[in-house]
Amino acid sequence: MPSPATPARIVLTTTANPEEAARLGRALVEERLAACATLIPAVQSIYRWQGAVESAAETLLLLKTGTGQLVALEARLRELHSYQTPEFLVLVVEAASQPYLDWLQSSLGQP
């Protein structure tokens, strides 16, 4: 039987460019909605938008957070993001080292 998942989550969103990803990541970490933001530049996305298949160069932003921050994180991301419909995908972290989980939890919460 698999072990229960940790309270850690990874949120994926894409941005128009590295500058926007850095701005969003910094704001969300400063506001303690994310413990860490990792930027992966130069990804290529292919998607359907308003009936047409589109392609765009984007920056992938990975946000490490906890279950208790997800609602506020999504709301704040929607406020700050330039996209009309920003991506907000949540991945469950099945396992992580206890020191990392301790750090993550201590980095979240009230500023």
Residue ranges of predicted features:
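Positively charged, small/polar-rich N-terminal and surface patches that mediate targeting and assembly
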Residues: M1-P111
